[in-house]
Regions:
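Flexible, solvent-exposed loop/hinge segments and secondary-structure transition points
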Residues: 2, 6, 18-19, 24-140, ...
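Extracytoplasmic/periplasmic C-terminal soluble domains
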Residues: 139-182
């Protein structure tokens, strides 16, 4: 019986140390070193109201905004995941055709604008995907296309640094910059 009680104490102490102690230390270090990312990379609008995270996509359908990649989980972070559909599945083609129709163009569309990412929550689109949307956004906002194009180019970055050729744009940050009139 003593061995059982001793073993139980060791298990409870180990769980407390690993679950509470380790987590507390890691959270404390993260808060001290990078508080913004430790809190979820939250993004605020001009009034200071938190409107989202730099790391999680949001759905935008208003023509005044740049639209993100489609999401297989309707931009629900709790349900993150892909559609698990085969590329040969007819539902993929049907979904892509509906998205293309929403853009209202016959021109070739960048692939990332009609295909969901693996988790369905990718907050970035390609520079080409953002630039493709310039005419619609500029018209809806009554802005000059060159102004919108310049803002997109300014916010585009190479995720792998100088070794990465393709540049991407964070959709939420771009839309907030558009709202701010940057």
């Amino acid at each position: 019986m003593n061995i059982l009680v001793s073993s139980l104490r060791v298990v409870v102490a180990s769980m407390g140390l690993c679950v509470v102690g380790y987590t507390g230390v890691i959270l404390g270090v993260a808060q001290a070193v990078t508080p913004a990312t430790a809190d979820g990379s939250l993004v605020a609008d001009a009034s200071g109201q938190v409107v989202g995270s730099r790391l999680v996509a949001q759905g935008f359908s208003d023509p005044r905004y740049v639209w993100p990649r489609p999401s297989a989980v309707n931009y629900d972070a709790a349900a993150a995941g892909g559609s698990n559909l085969s590329p040969a599945n007819p539902e993929i083609a049907t979904r892509a055709k509906a998205i293309i129709a929403a853009y209202g163009v016959d021109a070739p569309i960048p692939a990332d604008l009609v295909t969901a990412s693996g988790a369905g929550l990718d907050p970035h689109i390609s520079l080409a995907g953002a630039l493709f949307q310039v005419p619609r956004v500029a018209k809806a906002r009554g802005m000059d296309e060159d102004s919108v194009r310049g803002l997109i180019t300014r916010l585009a970055f190479a995720p792998g640094g100088p070794l990465t050729q393709d540049r991407i744009v964070n959709v939420l940050e771009l839309n907030l910059a558009l709202d701010a009139g940057a």
